[in-house]
């Protein structure tokens, strides 16, 4: 009968373990010096060796031939533990046996002396699944356990272990195993099992395992049945586990950086039809951008592997592609945040796509395309019609609508607000947005956004007509861009919004109305400030006479918005429209990528 690889090749001594050298050294010294605590807590990602270490410790403290370095695996104690027949080693699955009655049974047996071993060892896997009552029943026993008992708790969710338990145990965090170590182990096992597989395929499996040796062994076990005669290639691995090949990833990156919406979504259609693993796809995408960033900064082709060099030469990456990558990474404090910036770039494409998704062609980045120019002209004509209608209605638009809280009416619950796909902004007024931004005001944000505004104004007012037109054509909503360039300064700012002043009251009111009725302004704000922000626009006179005085005297009563509502306001929104099958597929693609889970 076939034995799965992760069981067959599970380490049975300290020497065979991978990637946890410091933990191994501490535990061996504790055993040699007889300084074992009442309990250990082993935490970390799946497949990093927590339960394996627990079993090896159980052998080490009872091994008849312990040599102060490792267990023998030949004495009766080691053999019984290896075959799971040792009475004094109790392994409990806390995910299924987590009730108070299960713990009471355990506690009753704790004080019984070991049958054959020197120490009894209780291993509780998935300890975070224990109930509060179970932890309470175990607490006293753990604190006053007899010297012949050792508790070992393993968990993937360290934060769920009660503090009262943590303070009575020694905790060790098991780090992820490096891809190099996993690759080395996979290569050894492939030779032992006589699996014909290319090195690149093993490298891909090691990468797919994401630091979990158990996952890597399971993947190797699965792919080993792919072929008996021919060598298993990296293409075979990609097909088996629904992974996008590197060529397609490079093509997708270039499409995103170029703003080629049609190409990007065509690629996503292909990925979806092939059962793409989106989580792994995003991680691979980011890894490739980091390599491209290193190449762009160092100007050294040797930082890329052979496949990446070929892809760059084939796809003709241009300077603007590298420029965006450098900006995306360097404007953040770490690579984790830069990944969010790259995702924001994809968000901008989604916004642009939704602006034109009922019209063809989808490509809007090429001014030389006659159809594309016709599409943009049609869009601008619609904007002009909206502008003319707006001028007729402008005199009826009130700056500060009454917003006193009617206590007789029930206010919506937070989850009702945050779950709305299209945010209702009809009940908002300029004052409550400005006051909310002021509540989270930070001078660092003011200075940061003011600098970006100055850069935008400088580029927008470039005397070189060709440069000016080129920069202007990058904006999805050109009308709001023309208005924002006339801003005088930013007076309040937070991570979700800005209060911005204008000399002309008409411009300020026009931007505000568009912000709450259409959402196009948010797309322009994103392009200028590289961040989703809600805009509260005032004339200098309005701000001075209204907001400043009312904030000072605290006379203005307005509905208080919570932080979640405010952050949702910052996100670009669009009117609900009938959505075709392809548009629903777009929603499916990006729902998991850009929404919090």
From Swiss-Prot:
Please name the Pfam families in this protein's record: DNA_pol3_delta2 (PF13177), DNAX_ATPase_lid (PF22608)
Q: Which PANTHER family match?
A: PROTEIN STICHEL-LIKE 2 (PTHR11669:SF0), REPLICATION FACTOR C / DNA POLYMERASE III GAMMA-TAU SUBUNIT (PTHR11669)
Query: Which top-rank group of organisms is this from?
Result: Bacteria
Catalysed reaction(s)?
DNA(n) + a 2'-deoxyribonucleoside 5'-triphosphate = DNA(n+1) + diphosphate
Inactivation phenotype = Probably essential, it was not disrupted in a global transposon mutagenesis study.
UniProt keywords (A-Z) are: ATP-binding, DNA replication, DNA-directed DNA polymerase, Metal-binding, Nucleotide-binding, Nucleotidyltransferase, Transferase, Zinc
The family annotation for this protein states: Belongs to the DnaX/STICHEL family.
Question: Which residues are listed as membrane-spanning?
Answer: none
Query: What's the protein here called?
Result: DNA polymerase III subunit gamma/tau
Indicate which residues the UniProt annotation says bind ATP: 44-51
Lineage of the organism: Bacteria, Bacillati, Mycoplasmatota, Mycoplasmoidales, Mycoplasmoidaceae
- What InterPro entries does the entry give? AAA+_ATPase (IPR003593), DNA_pol3_clamp-load_cplx_C (IPR008921), DNA_pol_III_sug/sutau_N (IPR012763), DNA_Rep/Repair_Clamp_Loader (IPR050238), HLD_clamp_pol_III_gamma_tau (IPR045085), P-loop_NTPase (IPR027417)
